[in-house]
Curated annotation (Swiss-Prot):
It is a peripheral membrane protein. One of its GO terms (biological process) is photosynthesis. It comes from Cycas taitungensis (Prince sago). The keyword Phosphoprotein does not apply. This is Photosystem I assembly protein Ycf3. Belongs to the Ycf3 family. GO terms for cellular component: chloroplast thylakoid membrane. Keywords: Chloroplast, Membrane, Photosynthesis, Plastid, Repeat, Thylakoid, TPR repeat. Pfam families: TPR_1 (PF00515). PROSITE patterns: TPR, TPR_REGION. It is found in: Plastid, Chloroplast thylakoid membrane. Transmembrane segments: none annotated. Its main location: plastid.
């Protein structure tokens, strides 16, 4: 039984019913319906419950029939989120890059890439490697600038960090 049919709370049940009705009413290709089902199972159920392995499997399944680059970008972004949550930063960065190749207007992907770079910069500081720390911090700054350019009202903490570190105007 698909995860979407096992939802236990009212919100998930309501979303599932509405999504199923929309899939029947709106003309969509069979591949799009299949991709959406896997995507819905990954997002609404497995990932939100912390079942990351199952969510990843659903996202990978959603990638097979999904051909729209915009929709694929969100699937790739969500795969990156799971890898980031699991501490697999290199894999997360790869998926964020793939998402941005298909949809360069994803400020959240730029933000998450900046967070990873900032974290790596902090690690380098703790390891006594200021040159590497500076390089990672510079990369974080570039990604945050891109995120802020796409969503100017968001990422206030990043904007403050850029100001404090003197990287805002660079």
């Amino acid at each position: 039984m698909p995860r979407s049919q096992r939802n236990d709370n009212f919100t998930d049940k309501t979303f599932t019913i509405v999504a199923d009705i929309l899939l029947r009413i709106i003309p969509t290709a069979p591949g799009e319906k299949e991709a959406f089902t896997y995507y819905r199972d990954g997002v609404m159920s497995a990932q939100s419950e912390g079942e990351y392995a199952e969510a990843l499997q659903n996202y990978y399944e959603a990638m097979r029939p999904e051909i729209d680059p915009y929709d694929r970008s969100y699937i790739l972004y969500n795969i990156g989120l799971i890898h980031m949550s699991n501490g697999e930063h290199t894999e997360a960065l790869e998926y964020y890059f793939q998402a941005l190749k298909r949809n360069p207007s994803l400020p959240q992907a730029f933000n998450n890439m900046a967070v990873i770079c900032h974290y790596r910069g902090e690690q380098a500081i703790r390891q006594g490697d200021p040159e590497t720390a500076e390089a990672w911090s510079d990369r974080a700054a570039e990604y945050w600038k891109q995120a802020i350019a796409l969503a100017p009202g968001n990422y206030i903490e990043a904007q403050n960090w850029l100001k404090i570190t003197g990287r805002l105007g660079e």
